[in-house]
């Protein structure tokens, strides 16, 4: 199943009246069927297994070496941008289109990806696809909200409001950890959440969302 080039939906860019539409062609099997992991380092019952399964079946993220997903491997920004372009058939734009000149001093695609980096990339990509990004969450509910970079605050607020990013327990507090690194497992989980939020049928079925 994995390794074939398939995308069972397409994102329609425009005014956002119709966000996603089914394409003809191959689609995944019923998402609630038991999944047999093709990876030697991913068990079916791990917290990140649904995300790994989803990005594998969509051919968005690929194995590292022979049958290894490397779920704990750190995701870098350029690799995540490539995943977004693969997922949305280039609708999120090139590096220059996604991050115009005003972002140059604040955001570069070089280096490993933090949680706020991931939020910014998904936020910009979602905006470019004509999908409503006005929802906002309350960053002040997190004890480290002041650590979020100014340019990343709209994206982080949106990611919290949509449920893409969730708080991390740190003692008695809940933190955002905006400067924390992002693993491949975390990235694929957020992609699954994004597709569920946007109404992608397989993603919603996999998470049991009606």
Task: Name each region found by the language model.
Residues 162-164:
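Short, charged, amphipathic alpha-helices and their helix-cap/turn boundaries
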Residues 9-49, 57-117, 124-153, 166-184, ...:
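Feature responds to low-complexity, polar/acidic, surface-exposed segments characteristic
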Residues 1:
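Short, aromatic- and glycine-rich surface loops/edge beta-strands on solvent-exposed regions
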């Amino acid at each position: 199943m994995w390794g074939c080039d398939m995308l069972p939906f397409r994102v329609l860019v425009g005014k956002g009246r119709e966000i996603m539409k089914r394409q003809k062609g191959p689609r995944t099997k019923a998402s609630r069927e038991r999944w047999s992991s093709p990876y030697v380092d991913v068990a079916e019952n791990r917290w990140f297994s649904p995300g790994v399964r989803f990005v594998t079946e969509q051919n968005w993220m690929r194995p590292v070496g022979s049958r290894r997903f490397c779920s704990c491997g750190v995701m870098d920004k350029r690799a995540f941008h490539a995943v977004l372009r693969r997922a949305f058939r280039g609708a999120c734009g090139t590096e220059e289109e996604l991050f115009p000149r005003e972002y140059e001093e604040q955001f570069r695609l070089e280096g490993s990806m933090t949680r706020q980096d991931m939020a910014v990339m998904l936020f910009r990509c979602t905006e470019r696809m004509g999908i409503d990004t006005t929802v906002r969450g309350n960053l002040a509910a997190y004890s480290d909200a002041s650590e979020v970079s100014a340019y990343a605050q709209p994206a982080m607020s949106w990611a919290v409001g949509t449920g893409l990013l969730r708080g991390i327990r740190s003692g008695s507090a809940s933190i955002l950890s905006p400067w924390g690194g992002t693993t491949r497992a975390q990235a694929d989980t957020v992609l699954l959440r994004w597709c569920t939020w946007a109404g992608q049928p397989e993603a919603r079925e996999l998470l049991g969302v009606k």
